[in-house]
Amino acid sequence: MSATSSKETLGFQAEVKQLLQLMIHSLYSNKDIFLRELISNASDAADKLRFEALSDAALFENDPELKIRIAFDRDARTLTISDNGIGMSRQEVIDHIGTIAKSGTREFFSQLSGDQKKDAALIGQFGVGFYSAFIVADRVTLTTRRAGLTAEHGVRWESEGAGDYTLETVEKPQRGTEIVLHLREGEDEFLSDWKIKSVIRTYSDHITLPIVMKKTEWKDGVETPTDEDETVNKASALWARPKKDISDDEYNEFYKHVAHDFEPPLAWSHNRVEGKQEYISLLYVPSHAPFDLYDREKRHGIKLYVRRVFIMDDAEQLMPQYLRFVRGVIDSADLPLNVSREILQSSRDIDAIKNGSVKKVLGMLEDLAENQPEKYVEFWKEFGKVMKEGPGEDFANKEKIAGLLRFASTHTDTDAQVVSLKDYVGRMKEGQTAIYYITADSFAAAQHSPHLEIFRKKGIEVLLLSDRVDEWLTGNLHEFDGKPLKSVAKGGLDLGELEDEAEKTAQKEAEESMKPLVERIKAMLGERVKDVRVTHRLTDSPACLVTGEGDMSANLERLLKAAGQAAPTVKPTLEINPSHALVTRLDSESDEDRFKDWANLLFEQALLAEGGQLDDPASFVRRLNGLLAMLPG
């Protein structure tokens, strides 16, 4: 469209209408946030200009002093926030103001809870803070021009927050963005110098850009702006200040700025590293998970600066995938200003910064787990599943990550993941040499698995793993504190010193006496099983299925197939309980057809008990009904 195009009216994306209503009605009691959001956006625009100007200084247009200006007009009842940052082109206005990113809309609205505090957190998280202007304004006018375009390529966007907005091309000599809020009736407090400065100092003191207002003076009992500017905020990089000079409130507000979050963080770590590498890191652990936590392709949360100059958002090379929830800033004194993402991938300096930062985050989590366990429980509920990716990604810190993991177990027998491996080892029975676990596709399936029967009888604790990522975890974490991790559903069971001689003798006798039955069942089941043997892991169930020590677990096989991935079919071993009535009934069965039905029923119910699916459910039902019909009436 040409620079001289006339005004046009465009409709908001449907989701934007919903969002505007949410902003106006749900967040009113927390309305000061609109100013923080607009200032934060202006600060981001300045950061982007600084970065683009590294390769094209002409973008500064002889105006390199970046600032945010705030002004109010009592007569017109307007509040104006302007910046001389990067600005926007016409298409960028349509993309960023008229729509919300398509990928995020469904998740956004599915997560709205009606809880004002939680919904406010989502708004920041989805990067839609601009719309908070409508909390206090019934009309918003945005005028902008992108750096590098000529004055006639200015764009004016205006909306009353209903179903549509207007867009027109205007002259704008200065680059950057100006937002004029036409205040609603009853919002006169935002026409007060004191109120605006109070909000800025509360929420935006840490913004590195100067936030400028006209000084005011009192004349005849009326507060009147003068021609003299004053900077309202501290306008210095918070992370570069000494820790002792920064209050908890300042740390919290800075987090909300860098993370676009409305909730305070769970913990933070502020460090200045000197020596071979010189850098400052200010890293935060959020108090809640972002909506896209499990999308490994989505943005990371670390902003990279070089000597206070913003370089890039979402610098994925600075934090491994399993710590993708960490937010914050890293400011290097050594990297070149023209550093690119490609350079980051092969930079030893970046590797050193990453390694140091990971250690700080893990140390912060260790401190939380040890000194504030109730907070760590909250952390684990939000981020536990991604932490379980760690041992497979970060070999150097595997033991440290393992110490941070939490699980459900038979010790508590609830689905709360509160048991650490250190806790488990501390409770191991005398003579126990392994850490036992079971994986299943639900907590109930793990908790009630027949594989646990002998362990429950002997009081041996078993970890109950039911997260999808647990299969990945156990495939990469093989031991802790010198103790191997062993699945109770894999391989032969050898409890060693945990069984007495009488038990071992009884097992051998049962194996010997059941040999003919074992051979009959094996012949009858044929290709359905790898082997059949007598078990000593069952006390109440007639049978269970186990896989080989080096084989893929049945649960992992199901997960892969459900995800549409190729997975080898692993034949299980059927283990039978020699003391169970069904097994003794089978042993005495002389009719070959009935024996076949009993043997298949035994296998199929063992398959169901471990969460498996039957290839032919109708045959299972037919067999079961036939055998039930034979019972005495």
From Swiss-Prot:
Region named C: 559-633
Region (A): 1-341
Region (B), start-end ranges: 342-558
Subcellular localization, as worded in the UniProt entry: Cytoplasm
Record's keyword terms, sorted: ATP-binding, Chaperone, Cytoplasm, Nucleotide-binding, Stress response
SMART domains xrefs: HATPase_c
Gene3D superfamilies, alphabetized: 3.30.230.80, 3.40.50.11260, Heat shock protein 90, C-terminal domain (1.20.120.790), Histidine kinase-like ATPase, C-terminal domain (3.30.565.10)
GO molecular function: ATP binding; ATP hydrolysis activity; ATP-dependent protein folding chaperone; unfolded protein binding
Subunit structure: Homodimer.
PANTHER family attached to this UniProt entry: HEAT SHOCK PROTEIN 90 FAMILY MEMBER
Protein family according to the UniProt entry: Belongs to the heat shock protein 90 family.
Protein name listed in UniProt: Chaperone protein HtpG
Source species: Thiobacillus denitrificans (strain ATCC 25259 / T1)
Biological classification of the source: Bacteria, Pseudomonadati, Pseudomonadota, Betaproteobacteria, Nitrosomonadales
Name of the encoding gene: htpG
